[in-house]
Structure formats: C-alpha cells, structure tokens
Amino acid sequence: MESSAYPMLFSPIKVGTTEVKNRVFMPPVSTNLADHGYVTDDLVDHYRARAKGGVGLIITEVVTVEPTYTYLPGDMCCYDDTFIPGWEKLAAAVHEYGCKIMPQLFHPAYMAFNIPGTPRLIAPSFVGPFYAREAPRPITVDEIHELTHQFGDAAVRMQKAGVDGVEVHAAHAHGMLGGFLTPLYNKRTDEYGGSLDARMRFLLEVIAEIRERCGKDFIIDVRISGDEYTDGGLTLNDMIYVSRRLEKAGVDMIHVSGGTTIKRGSAIPAAGTQQASHAACSREIKKHVNIPVATVGRINEAWIAEELIEDGAADICMMGRADLCDAEFCNKAAAGNADDIRPCIGCLRCLNGIMFGKRISCTVNPDVERDEAGYEPAAEAKNVLVVGAGPAGMEAAYIAAKRGHNVVLVDKQDEPGGEMRIAAVPPAKQELTRVIKYQYRRLAEAGVKCVFGTELSAEDIQRDYAGYEVVLAYGAEPIAPAFMQGFKQVMTADDLLGGKAFPGKKIVIVGGGTVGCETADYLAPLVNDLSPANRDVTVIEMTKTLAANEGGAGRAVLITRMLSKGVHVLTEAKVTEITEDAISYEKDGEVHTIADADTLVLAMGYRPNTKLADDLAAAGVATHVLGDANKCGNIRDAIGDGYKVACEL
C-alpha cells in the first residue's frame, strides 16, 4: 500500500521474517463478541471490516490460554483444539485483504472476571490491585511450569489455525506476566522474584517455549509498559534493559505501551490528554534495540502517526480507537482523504462498557461491530423531513439519504451541531467539533438538503411537508426548577457554555454530573494559585458520586483536574432553599447557607421538549421521535438512535 499523503506510514515493514504491507497496526481492544471463548461470526465481521479497511496487522483482544480463569466473559480462548476452527475462519477472513493477524495471549491472574464458581484467584504474590475481588493465592513453581507449557500449547494451536504470530501481554502491571514483571505485585523471594532479572524469568521462559515449538517464522511480539508512571513501579531504564533482553530472547517486535491499570488514565489515555502518550518511551527504547518498536496511546490521526515514524519515535503505530471508529481509516488516509475519516474523540466509550461484560460500542460509530454494513437500500424511496441538526438528526438524515430517501434537514439554529456545540466548550472536549464537521460534511455527499435558521411549527410541517416521513430530533431543554429562579443571578450550564450568560466570581453549581463537573472545570482557574483574580467555584451534588455516568479514565482525569484547580465539592448535599442572596443546602442532617455567592449555575440534567411532537400527534401526524427529544442520553445514544430509526424508514 503506497500513499503520497503519508509515505512513511503506508510503507511496508518486516517483522521477523514476515513482511507487513504498512505500519498501521491495530492493537488489542476487547470486544466481548466471543461466545464462551469461541470465535463468532460477529467477531469475524468485525475484524474483516478492519482488514478490508487497510490495516497492516491486527492484534486481537486477549485470548486466555487455560480454562480456569476468564478475563472478560466475551473474550476468546485457545486452551484446547475445539477453538481452532473458529480461528481458521477468522485468519482466513483477515488474510483475504492482505492483512496479518495475531492473538494476544494472556492469563488474567488477579484480573479474572467474577464468574460464579471461579476458584480463588492466583497471582505472582498475595497482593493485587485495589479492585481485585479477593486477595490472590501465590502461584506455585509447578503451576508456573504448567502455565508456561499452556502458553506454548496456545501458540501452537494458533499457528495451526493460520495466524501469523502471537503477542504476549506483559504490560500495565496487568495479568499474570505483567504482574510478575512489576515490583508492584511481585513480592516473591524465590527464583521468580526479587531482582528484575528474576521477575522477567517467567516471561522469558514463555517466549522460549513459544519460539521452540513454533519456529523462527512465527512472529513473537511482547507488549510492555515503557514506564509504569507509578511510584514503586517499573521505570524507563528498567524497560530499556527488559527490551534488550527480549530482543536477545528472540522476540521480533516490542509493543511499547505505558502506565498501569491502577493509575487510571495512565495506560489508556482519555479525551483531551496528550496524543501518542507513550511515544517518549518508545523513542528511547528504539535507540537500544534492533527490532521493530511500536508505539500506542491515542494516536487518532494519520498525520500524527506519520510524524512519529518519520521522527524516529517508533517504527509502527498502533491505532486502535481510530480503526474502531472508522474501519476504513487506512484506505481513506492512504488516498489522501483524511477529512472523510470518522473522527475518534478518545472518549473511551469503547472501553467503559466492555469492562462490565457489554459488547463493544463507540460514541461516533453506531455500527462499530461491522462499520456501516448494517443498513440496506430502502425498499421504497420516501420523502423524509428531519427536524434538528444535532448528532441524532444529522445521523438520521445521512443514513436515510444513503438508503435512497429524499431528505430535508431543518434546524432553528444558524449552524449544525445542536447540543454538541455546547458540549465541545469545556476543556478536553474540543474534539467534538471534529464530529460536527464530519457529520455535516457527509450530508452534502449524501444529497441531504439542509435548511438552517428556520423553526418549524406543527402547522408549517402540515402545510409544507405533507406526505413526508417526519423525524423529530430537536433535543431537550435544561431542567430549571422554579424555586431556584429567585437568586440574583441564575443561569443554566448551557447558557453559560453557549456564551448567552456570563458568571461572576463566586459561583455555585447545582448538579455534579458530567455537565456540572465539566462546567466547574471550565470556570476554575488553570492553576490553583489562590490569586484574588481567580473564580471561586463550588459544586453541590445530591448523590455521593461525581460524574457518575462517566467511566474509568475519563472520569478520573476530569475529577482530578477539577479538584487540582481548587473547585470545592459538596456531595450528598441537597439544595433546600434559595433566596435572592443566599443558597441553603442540607448535608449530614444539618442545614448550611452560602451567603456570598454571586452566581447560581444549574446543571441538573435535561428533559425532552415534547411540544412539537405533541402538537403533531394532536393533528394526527405520525412522527419518529429520537435522540434527546425522546429520551435524554449521551452523544453515543443520540447517534445510535438516529442510525437505528433511519435504518427502519
């Protein structure tokens, strides 16, 4: 695959004895699409779409090598020969497009999923991360030898199935091999613990087992943390030494990640954080080895990947979320059509659900499993009116037009985006503007007629769009209780973020959900230096959890950043009374009053605006109501709703 736009990224590279057509590799991303460890048609379709889209090499999600412990209920396994036929089908589907494929071999150790009947967890030592469900039992030396053989057995099965190699997961203080390598969890005093050489012994024995049994033409890749970024964890100097030992042991490629699972956001970076977050580590490790080095970590644009390779930070770029968000990422980038790539915003929705056993999903791509293979041409072309150019409305309009319908999109605002324009204002949310531009750009390509600056009434629709299928996607309105309107300066978070209102210096935000916390983050000073010029921001939340609907790394980064700026937080506190000059709240059975605030910001959620739908229903006009106009949710819900309804028109 050649590209004048990104010549380095789309040049071939040799990994071991195998030539890969380009340097965009897809790293392991759990999908939960397997069935009791077996490859499913959904899994085959998922990876086939990425192979067809131009990826050079795919590393699948973790594949467990023994039957007792499961990482996630929808992950794959290879602990006996019954799994081989499914892998044969998967490998053949990927190879059809000149793409290589490797499973990531893994034992979950203290990370095992809590499935009833699972015995006590095993680990390098009796310690595990704070979220482990119990104190693990140290694995015995005999069990280490048995597990080493099981890694080899799994690799042999994969070789029989026709895959091109395996990745061994030893990163993030994660799973058995990552746990043995890190001093955070390896407290052993036998030959497998203590010094760095002893802690990597198990990993080296696994590599030797696989190489001996699978031969020199079978790729062995090891995923490591170039630095665990954690007190008491592995350092970059440690990992330079480990990398040199891995090369000497016969490893063909080193996949340099970073961080740990216990330091949220360090391994898999959240939205708004540094792109190519582990490139500094891969750059340094690359200086000390003579085998290909891959880097990873929110590399979601082709130009970033091109610069990383050209600048010597890595030989290969692992681009997971980018390829999830748009399976055609590589083909579009190679052709110089980067503007047509569905933009990954780094929000980690793809990760948050799978950790609880849910199937993979994506905020921006509603058909992430197959990538737009789910809709078919309409049996009959219809005239379709979509009211509202937010994420739900634009998705519905595009898919309906692609299916063959004649679509008109009308919005009362002067530009597209709806609530997403406001959502893009706080820190770390700016990439939502790329989604707006992408969705809007597609409308012209699909032939959608867009009318802005026009608010339609039920009478307008009956008169001007008689006979049209009517899709209502005009969003929701902020909740603003009447008793809170008496304060001297009241505004909703939407009005503040949308530039319709300007706050004072001492601000109280009612509501500590995502919007409330992001608004506080937006208002607070960048540096908490106690300057008299700084705003003083307090968030009042009636539950015990801030930003409860955010997950994992994204929530951790948001809350940590907000608190570091000096935002005051009152959880399990309920506003009870508001006068012109005071805000009273109850906490722990006592009533407190804030008497010196000058601004009250309401971030208490949203409710669907049903007036237009009600008026049309009263007039006997059938409608499809979607997005926040139907049920308030997040951007993923809105886009998914638009996709689903449009597929049914």
Give each language-model segment a name.
Residues 264-271, 292, 315-316, 420-428, ...:
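Short beta-alpha connecting loops at secondary-structure transitions
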Residues 409-446, 520-575:
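Rossmann-like dinucleotide-binding cores of NAD(P)H-dependent redox enzymes
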Residues 257, 296, 365, 453-455, ...:
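Conserved beta-strand termini and adjacent loop/short-helix elements that scaffold enzyme active sites
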Residues 381-410, 451-463, 473-489, 493-550, ...:
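Rossmann-like dinucleotide/flavin-binding elements
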Residues 289, 312-313, 446, 486, ...:
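Short, structured coil segments at secondary-structure junctions
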